Swiss-Prot record:
Catalytic activity: ATP + H2O + a folded polypeptide = ADP + phosphate + an unfolded polypeptide
UniProt gene name: groEL
GO biological process, one term: protein refolding
Coiled coil: none
Organism for this UniProt entry: Desulforamulus reducens (strain ATCC BAA-1160 / DSM 100696 / MI-1) (Desulfotomaculum reducens)
Protein name: Chaperonin GroEL
Quaternary context: Forms a cylinder of 14 subunits composed of two heptameric rings stacked back-to-back. Interacts with the co-chaperonin GroES.
UniProt KW keywords: ATP-binding, Chaperone, Cytoplasm, Isomerase, Nucleotide-binding
Source domain of life: Bacteria
Presence of the UniProt keyword Chaperone in the record: yes
Amino acid sequence: MAKEIIFREDARRALERGVNALAEAVKVTLGPKGRNVVIEKKFGAPTITNDGVTIAREIELEDNFENMGAQLVKEVATKTNDVAGDGTTTATVLAQALVREGLKNVAAGANPMIIKRGIEKAVEKAVEEIKAMAKPIESKEAIAQVATVSANDDSIGNLIAEAMEKVGKDGVITVEESQGIGTNLEVVEGMNFDRGYISPYMITDTDKMEAALTDPYILITDKKVSSVQELLPVLEKVVQTGNKPVLLICEDLEGEALATLVLNKLRGTLNVVAVKAPGFGDRRKAMLEDIAILTGGTVITEEVGLKLDKAELDMLGTARQIRVKKEETIIVGGAGEQAQIEGRIAQIKKQIEETTSDFDREKLQERLAKLAGGVAVIQVGAATEVEMKEKKLRIDDALNATRAAVEEGIVPGGGSAFVNIITTLDSVQLEGDAKTGVDIVKRALEEPLRQIANNAGLEGSVVVEKVRTTGKGFNAMSEEYVDMIAAGIIDPAKVTRSALQNAASIAAMVLTTETLVADKPEKDAPNPMAGMGGMGGMGGMM
């Protein structure tokens, strides 16, 4: 296919137009007075959201060259979301500012490669300062503050803090849609393990890239399954008794067996999601036994004379719900007998007391937490489905932000952490275009606060200057200058750091781009019937 090529300044300007198109759509959502964005859906009601990455994922531009710029910024938002789970709008705003300031200097004749070096040195120093500024987070109140700032809602903040208190900071917290209009917290017996679906064709929710199974059977074996004949007898029994979904936990699934299960899933005849068994060696056997006890099933292993092709329905476990992601499986509401679960917990506690190996003790404690800790389920309710989806996105973001805060600590929120570190970049001693790179980062660091102020209907530059001179932060909700940490307006250090690193990475790529290559738009083929309109007059030939 023929390609279109554009060079130098034309190429960089096309990328900038794409960057701006996406950033302008996303940045209106920043801060407590940020607005919403409405996204049309092919089917059903539109989505209303203020989540940066959700908006970014929906944007495709008609012009191929501009679209490249938009996709690069989309990568900033997505990467920040993957690493920190929040801060996607901040990352987008930073990327736009770095690109804008950088391209001004490149157009004026600066060397982009040397500017890039200056940007990298400045970001390295800024990240060091963010880490040094971070305060560890301990109390339930501090956790609630982080979640409140992220979700822009006190009640959600308190709910997440309560969930973390109940299942521990490393516990499993999931967010589900509720039938009612209230949002509440429920702690359910459940467990998670770090294995995801074997094939992406098994997912049921393409937006979240996960498989959700309600009231499924759970088939547990330590075998590698490659022949579908081994599975057929038990799967036929499942189909005859109401065709419930099935979670298959096995050593591996391959060849004909995998192909057949995927084909049946795509046809809608049988919904089987397969995951590899967690752990290794003897620990794997113990973990499979834990899952079996939790779900009321049996581990089908030839070591005790059980064969897969002879499996009965009563050997299968069940659970209220299972969610399988790319690298994690969460089992909620296992149907195992309480007495057996308690017996297993007591057995693991005894092993913890007796073991002399620190490594074994750590792994046993992990198993104990999975069996005893349970899963906290936040059930999201709202008056309409559109509102519920928007609320669920905010809770997901707040949960991710809170986990990030527990991991790396907190810094002053509302964009003030970025403004506070601008003066520390004076210590980065560089010359010429490299110094220009440092200055570009300094100007870009003002941008999140400027945008928060603009969204609150104030003059951003005035607010930035006041924050720089007073050393306080700006509370956009009350429009006051306050000590941000004391006021509970805080951001996770991990989110702040990731947003800056990812924005700088993509901005440096845009600045050092010299050529863009894209497919040439195809001309529409002429309609072969268009020239035959005059044939209608042949009726008179009779």
